[in-house]
């Protein structure tokens, strides 16, 4: 394994350095080839490194930043006032070649805008998309995008997402000829927004994409598709709804409930069932798949959930390591070169092709 360097915006997220710095130390402990650039306020970061040993400190460097982009700031305003912010400095380290990827739990809109401004989209990509890998009930994984980078998407953008998602499924998960589906309100050809139906027609003409049609949200975790494509609004709502349900389910499994009046053997049986079910469904825990990759850029950017805990942010760092090692941007660029000659172009009026819904 070759050495690699990541830039961490340690000031971003709901909890800032109190979570991101311990997560950085955890990541260093798990990967001896990793070097981390901690971008933020040195006075806040330094005390949190007290438990780091000499070997870990040799693979750490604090990069000062003057400010933090607020999580509730409007993206346009945040970008204009971003100079010297921890997020922008971390991205600039990637642009300058000092780091191979950036990880941030900060403002999603600002991260998207700054990454596009500084790192530039790949040739043939209109706008980058946020992608994550979710577990399903067949104990496999599904690539899902967009998860919030683009609230409104035309048909061409959805096709581009399908191309990028296919590359991720092949290169990161190792799926040969991955199945691709569009998230829709029904499986019938006439259902959904014009943009979705137009994207469906386009995907049928691309030989390098194994397009299987529409998928409804209730089948997200069934394993019926390897890549699920949707606009950022739908994807974000779907993901957060799923995370909330899974967290509630796992919490119910762990709760003790009314146990005081039960006999000892019923208590033992209940605890055994709780442990068994928790083990059975623990792979659905959202913390285990934290970290959405911003696909379609000339560099690697990972967006962590803003409310991520230490374990979850460490997972996001590992996602960045995997993306760099798999050379995701380069592989997407190569696939785009092979796909575009297949004959899809920006549809006339595509930007306005998503205003009508067919039920």
From Swiss-Prot:
Which key words are in the record? Cytoplasm, Lipid biosynthesis, Lipid metabolism, Phospholipid biosynthesis, Phospholipid metabolism, Transferase
One GO cellular component from the entry? cytoplasm
Q: Which GO terms describe its molecular function?
A: phosphate:acyl-[acyl carrier protein] acyltransferase activity
Where does the sequence pass through the membrane? Answer: none
Gene3D superfamilies tied to this protein: Isopropylmalate Dehydrogenase
Q: Which reaction does it catalyse?
A: a fatty acyl-[ACP] + phosphate = an acyl phosphate + holo-[ACP]
Oligomer and partners = Homodimer. Probably interacts with PlsY.
Q: Which family does it belong to?
A: Belongs to the PlsX family.
**Annotated function:** Catalyzes the reversible formation of acyl-phosphate (acyl-PO(4)) from acyl-[acyl-carrier-protein] (acyl-ACP). This enzyme utilizes acyl-ACP as fatty acyl donor, but not acyl-CoA.
Name of this protein = Phosphate acyltransferase
